[in-house]
Amino acid sequence: MKVEVAIGEIFDKIAILDIKLARIQDSERLKYVRGERDVLGVALQNEGIDIDLELYEELKDINTKIWDTEAGFRDKEAKKEFDEEFVEFARLNAKYNDERFLVKKRINEHYECEIREQKSYDRLYNAD
């Protein structure tokens, strides 16, 4: 199946797959991650799209924060520890997801992409 998506979504997916390639140890899972990463890389090449490394790295850094926050959140939830740290993980997750949205928006604008993600709420989260 082929679906047209915003370029920011493709950058996001590639960043997440690259994080998985660095962190997943299971060879069977890695096979699928590599396969998906290769498909997306070829798709960008076929479209003549070069990845803006600065925007990509910014998005990857945010996705790494989300990954780490989500891991802490899941660990706390598994232990049924719904304490202050659990709440902080939830707040950070919302904050980082909004930062991620803003970077994807900049990517879409940079590439003049007509498909653009929209949030249903008016204000972005501020965990400060």
Q: What does each model-identified segment do?
A:
Residues 1-128:
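Extended, charge-rich alpha-helical interface modules
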